[in-house]
Amino acid sequence: MTASAYLDLLDELLRPGIAGLSAPLVDAQVRFVAGCQRPDGGFGGRQGGSDPYYTDFALRVLTWLAPAHEAFSRTAAYLAGRSLPPRDVVECFSLLSTRRLLERQRVGQDKGTVPFSASPAETTDENWDSPQAVLPGQLGFRTLATLSAPALDPLRLTEWLYGRLLPSGGFARTADDPRVSAYHTFLGALCFQMLGVEMPAVEDAVRAVQALRRPDGGYAELAGQSASQTNATAAALGFLTMHDGMLAENMAPAARFFAQMQSADGGLKPHAAVRGGDLLSTFTGLLTLWGLDARQQIDAAAVARFLRGAAHPGGGFLACDADDAADVEYTYYGVGTLALLRLWSTAP
């Protein structure tokens, strides 16, 4: 499976749920995300200027909800002005993912369509406790103005990635930390595949990530850590599935781990020591449970209630109801979780 295939399959999975979002909800999210664009065309977080990380998340949301938005052309100019090399594997992924989204818009324009678009349904968003009530609808397409995705030197990025690989396989979080990271290895693998280059020493990386598995069925983020983490587990399983390294006997324990992470507020916790859920953990956990065919492990109605509490009245999503500000990253997780809940409600 290529990274483009992996990311395209993710979009295809979420497409039916995205397509049924109500017009007021779509408009609120688009206004919020577009309002986070900086004068240079990039997007920022809660503080500071443009950052490739937040720019990627913003374009993902707009690709879902408003693929003809003028923000795309402004972002193309921002990305064209970025200098290489990236700061870390996360930024490398963000740059390549942003370029991929801009290229999708260009291809869609050439065909007279856009590759992904929400077609708002005539529904209200009052009853989020019922996932099926939130997300009925169907897909539509729109015409898109001409866009050009800026070029990123694939040779330079490939050489940069080679230089960040650990001798034991996979990627670390920083150059100063020799331990393999589940999250960075997953993103690094996606980077190689978006570049059309085979990841070196995949077998070593698979063994290194497999070694992060813990007795409760989850995975730690780093070697030497004793506690499993929701997002590390999702990243590890994503990487292992891509490279045929997921052992069948480990699937059910992983599903049980995610189920144990559902908190009293309905969201999934980042790890067992935290009391409440957050949208990042909720989205990645639900997405992975879907891939494990273990939907029955989670109370979807409780997730819907958690999601309603994380929705900001003016658009955007918070990390959880105790958060005080929305941002484009958590808006991506919020919209994605809405789409997953639609899948939950319609699956046989």
Predicted stretch roles:
Residues 2-22, 46-69, 84-109, 128-156, ...:
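An alpha-helical repeat/solenoid feature that recognizes helix-turn-helix modules
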Residues 25-41, 70-87, 106-130, 151-171, ...:
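Long, well-ordered core segments of solenoidal/helical folds
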